Amino acid sequence: MAKSKFERTKPHVNIGTIGHVDHGKTSLTAAITKYFGEFKAYDQIDAAPEERARGITISTAHVEYETEKRHYAHVDCPGHADYVKNMITGAAQMDGAILVVSAADGPMPQTREHILLARQVGVPAIVVFLNKVDQVDDAELLELVELEIRELLSKYDFPGDDIPIVKGSALAALEDKDKSIGEDAVRLLMSEVDNYIPTPERPIDQPFLLPIEDVFSISGRGTVVTGRVERGVIKVGEEIEIIGIRPTSKTTVTGVEMFRKLLDQGQAGDNIGALLRGVDREGIERGQVLAKPGSVTPHTRFKAEAYILTKDEGGRHTPFFTNYRPQFYFRTTDVTGIVTLPEGIEMVMPGDNVAMDVSLIVPIAMEEKLRFAIREGGRTVGAGIVSKIIE
């Protein structure tokens, strides 16, 4: 069968189901595909393939579907550890999340942890599906559970009072039972997702940024840097800043090449060579970035959320403590940093996820939500995301 062309007519949004184990994330995912996509049964989604992101193996199921308004790519993970890894590494980017909570149990430890992670990694918006409502006869009890969910969301700085909560039963939807809590609830959920989760700004519309991968000089022409444009557009003749590792400097892009052809501009996703005016080959290096002036700044100290690999995943065999000094791999280069653990946390074991403060020995062009790998001698031992810049 011929592969159908990916229709680019609708806005595209990346989404995922989050929540406590056995609250119905995978059943809900299956139910959504039943009405909005090519139906995928529970077992097809649950048998998620393994993939590698930043040196870490993660099991993630990807499904796609569309509403009248949008096209969605949806991720669902089989295990709690996979969620933690997925959210921290950004293996599957999430523009929004559907938090699934069982009405019979209410919020549980992983409900809390996934909300906290969503906050730390910058998931912009959450919509709630209160599942298994057919297991609760008492309307007052349902109200209490809803209140509890709203309070929990507010506690982690989501607008708990405004977040849509849809009540239903994923199982009823899958089994074509009680339509009001089955099919109708799933359709209502997707209309809330359509309206409440904002359409992300496309990379091409964001300010220009290119992480430098390589630098060389061309006799008679000057210095060329190569790399993949991460976001935005660069036109010949535009002024840019060179940021990170050394003091920030300004230059002008005098040429853009792709596949040995000269272009007027390079844009998000393009692998380009950029010719820079008046820059010495020695004055620029891999690990710096080219960026639109004023759009991003260099920093050395930040708070991060990180996942530390287990021994079986190829990570450390032993715990680490405050003053641990690994390399932090940002975009294209390793920078040594010193770790400070939060008060009350003595050590971090392989397999833990942890909040920590990091102080780099040289500044890197940085913003919140920037992801990194933690490495020791070129071997990945963890992954993290900048949750807050300190200085």
From Swiss-Prot:
Write the protein's name: Elongation factor Tu 2
Q: Which UniProt keywords apply?
A: Cytoplasm, Elongation factor, GTP-binding, Hydrolase, Magnesium, Metal-binding, Nucleotide-binding, Protein biosynthesis
Q: Where in the cell is it found?
A: Cytoplasm
Known EC number: 3.6.5.3
Q: What is its main location?
A: cytoplasm
* Region described as G4: 131-134
Q: Please give the function described in this protein's UniProt entry.
A: GTP hydrolase that promotes the GTP-dependent binding of aminoacyl-tRNA to the A-site of ribosomes during protein biosynthesis.
Q: Where is this region: G2?
A: 55-59
The organism is Bartonella quintana (strain Toulouse)
Q: Which family does it belong to?
A: Belongs to the TRAFAC class translation factor GTPase superfamily. Classic translation factor GTPase family. EF-Tu/EF-1A subfamily.
Q: What is the lineage of its organism?
A: Bacteria, Pseudomonadati, Pseudomonadota, Alphaproteobacteria, Hyphomicrobiales
Residue ranges for the region (G3) are 76-79
Give the transmembrane ranges. Answer: none
Give the reaction(s) catalysed. GTP + H2O = GDP + phosphate + H(+)
Which parts of the sequence bind GTP? 19-26, 76-80, 131-134
Q: Which GO terms describe its molecular function?
A: GTP binding; GTPase activity; guanosine tetraphosphate binding; translation elongation factor activity
Q: How is the quaternary structure described?
A: Monomer.
G5: where is this region?
169-171
Positions of the UniProt region annotated as G1:
19-26
Q: Which InterPro entries match?
A: EF-Tu_GTP-bd (IPR041709), EF-Tu_GTPase (IPR050055), EFTu-like_2 (IPR004161), EFTU_2 (IPR033720), G_TR_CS (IPR031157), P-loop_NTPase (IPR027417), Small_GTP-bd (IPR005225), T_Tr_GTP-bd_dom (IPR000795)
GO CC terms, sorted: cytosol
Gene3D superfamilies membership: P-loop containing nucleotide triphosphate hydrolases, Translation factors
What residues does the tr-type G domain cover? 10-201
Do you know which Pfam families this protein is assigned to?
GTP_EFTU, GTP_EFTU_D2, GTP_EFTU_D3
Q: Binding residues for Mg(2+), per the UniProt record?
A: T26
